[in-house]
Amino acid sequence: IGGPPCQGFSLAGNIGRSFIDDERNRLFKEFVRLVACVQPKMFVMENVAAMATHLKGKTIKTIVEAFETAGCGYKVKYAVLNSANYGVAQERRRIVIVGIRSGIDSEFSYPEKLEKIYTIKDVIDDLPKLKSGETSDIPNHVAMKHSAQMLEKMGYVKDGGNRMDIPEELRPKSGDVRKYIRYDSAKPSVCVTGDMRKIFHYEQNRALTARELARIQSFPDDFIFEGTSIQIQQQIGNAVPPKLAYQIALQVEEALDNGKVSEGKLYRKQREVS
């Protein structure tokens, strides 16, 4: 199970190198190498949703072929899942690639969507209210200190609003349109990333705390994050939501329980994993 960073895939088609050959994707190649050496019954790989359509499907085709020929070979399938459909209060679309080793008579089925859709308010509204720069006794529930200018700007943005709510003379003239917005309390959160400092709480004038972001990602409160505030945000933003991972794991368990294994098809030319 893994999510190797694949920074090179976004530019690979423009620089004359294939996805596999791009040095920036060395950790992906290492993932394939480990699958070939260890030959697990199944593997799961998660990555950004854009991988499914990059270069009109050429990139994902290359990835599937790499796993199909790894070791004894794998039956590979992929799908783009939205975490909001699996008990996570967040619109987060990610590709999930699953392989079953050749010789195992089984099929993997992606989890069915759950009926309930959670809003951001559902999962963080019970936490203590904080003003800019305030702290609390709850681990990782510490509010960022904002400047007076930033507090003035965010004060104009309504629940679910954006930078267009800010008077023109104060409105940022450039920058990411996904910033200077306020969460919509009636919807799942926007996708959590490693930098959420300019997206505001739906009713409090501040950015979300690390604990609030962790709850949106579906981490339990007893999971404590360590590091600087930026490091913690990156840890949370780069994570796979635990509730989504759980639903996938249940399907993996079912596929393994139903699978009949032919050990004779194992690839015998294994090398030691260094």
Task: Label the model's feature ranges.
Residues 7-177:
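Class I S-adenosyl-L-methionine
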Residues 134-274:
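C-terminal target-recognition/interaction regions appended to catalytic cores
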Residues 4-5, 40, 89, 220, ...:
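Proline-centered helix-kink/hinge sites
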Residues 1-2, 45:
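Redox-cofactor binding/interface segments in oxidoreductases and associated redox assembly factors
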Residues 4-8, 101, 196, 220-221:
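Short, small-residue-rich loop/turn micro-motifs
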Residues 1, 73, 78-80, 112, ...:
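Short, functionally important structural connectors and interaction interfaces within domains
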Residues 1, 10, 193:
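Short, conserved beta-strand segments within well-ordered enzyme catalytic domains
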